[in-house]
């Protein structure tokens, strides 16, 4: 068994040299001594050459030596694995005192903020929100609003036409006609929505937003219209504004007025248009103008937003520049 003693001593010496070699070196050692052609495996195979009466004792000695080396090998493997795990944990250690990643919260677009602010005010006065198609017929966009074909007011709308009868709506007023066709007075509605005109510069875009108001009942008068708009403008801008009503012309209202507010620079600024619903408009939807009257008002949402937040270029609302939009959170 001199060979067993030499192999055991060689194995112990080899393991001592592996104290800092790592798991790969341990695996190579295992294969060399305990693999299919390993030293201890060959010793076990050599038992067939030992006399039968001596074989159990010799086998026991081989197993004892083999197990002693395996115990050292397994202990070193466990120590190496623990050291590797500790090194990995140290490398991946998280400092729980560090601040977490900031969660960026979005905010409403300034145009959406204005629509929300306007509709909230008028909903408290009993107005309900109505909507309608953005692809509109010539009848609802013009004819029913007292703007017949060849009327000069049509030229001011810079219309996007699909064909002679179909267009992208230039105003949300068509929804008023659709509502009056379905309902009888009293009617109290507001119509926020997108409208389209073929114009693009610092104060105009091809698509923008309007909010229209319509109130119809018996004995509705211009004084009520003025009172509602006075209260709205002062609530919207949160200031005790100077407001004036300037005579104007709209085909679908009579009398008509433009509403101005006094700016901080001492100049009047136009903010919306309004008037009493024209009798011809009422007749077109089957409402008797001798029994009912009403007022209508229309405002550009981007215009109101620019004035409220001191924005000078309308196009800023459509460029999706986060540096601009973050100011309105």
From Swiss-Prot:
GO terms for biological process: phenylalanyl-tRNA aminoacylation. It is found in: Cytoplasm. Its EC number is 6.1.1.20. The keyword Cytoplasm applies. Keywords: Aminoacyl-tRNA synthetase, ATP-binding, Cytoplasm, Ligase, Magnesium, Metal-binding, Nucleotide-binding, Protein biosynthesis. Its cofactor is Mg(2+). Mg(2+) binds at residue 254. GO terms for cellular component: cytoplasm. It comes from the Bacteria. It holds the Pfam family tRNA-synt_2d. Belongs to the class-II aminoacyl-tRNA synthetase family. Phe-tRNA synthetase alpha subunit type 1 subfamily. This is Phenylalanine--tRNA ligase alpha subunit. It comes from Mannheimia succiniciproducens (strain KCTC 0769BP / MBEL55E).
């Amino acid at each position: 068994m001199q060979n067993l003693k030499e192999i055991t001593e060689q194995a112990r010496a080899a393991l001592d040299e592996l104290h800092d070699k790592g798991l790969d070196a341990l695996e190579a050692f295992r294969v060399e001594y305990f693999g299919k052609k390993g030293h201890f495996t060959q010793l076990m195979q050599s038992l067939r050459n030992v006399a039968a009466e001596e074989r159990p004792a010799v086998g026991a000695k081989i197993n004892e030596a083999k197990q002693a080396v395996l115990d050292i090998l397994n202990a070193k493997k466990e120590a190496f694995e623990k050291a590797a795990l500790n090194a990995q944990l140290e490398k991946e250690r998280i400092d729980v005192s560090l601040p977490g990643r900031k969660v960026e919260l979005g905010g409403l677009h300034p145009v959406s903020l204005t629509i929300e602010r306007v509709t909230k005010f008028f909903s408290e006065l009993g107005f309900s929100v109505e909507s309608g198609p953005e692809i509109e017929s010539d009848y609802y966009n013009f004819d029913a609003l007292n703007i017949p074909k060849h009327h000069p007011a049509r030229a001011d709308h810079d219309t996007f036409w699909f064909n002679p009868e179909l267009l992208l709506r230039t105003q949300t007023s068509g929804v008023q006609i659709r509502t009056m066709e379905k309902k009888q007075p009293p009617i109290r509605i507001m119509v926020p929505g997108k409208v389209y005109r073929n114009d693009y510069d610092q104060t105009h875009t091809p698509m923008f937003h309007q909010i229209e108001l319509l109130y119809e009942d018996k004995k509705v008068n211009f004084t009520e219209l003025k009172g509602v708009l006075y209260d709205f403008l002062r609530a919207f801008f949160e200031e005790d504004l100077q407001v004036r009503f300037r005579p104007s012309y709209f085909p679908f209202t009579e009398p008509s007025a433009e509403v101005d507010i006094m700016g901080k620079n001492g100049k009047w600024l136009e903010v919306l248009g309004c008037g009493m619903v024209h009798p011809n408009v009422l007749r077109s939807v089957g409402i008797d103008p001798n029994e009912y009257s009403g007022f209508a008002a229309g405002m550009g949402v981007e215009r109101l937003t620019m004035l409220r937040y001191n924005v000078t270029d309308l196009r800023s609302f459509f460029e999706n520049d986060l540096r601009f939009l973050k100011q309105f959170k």
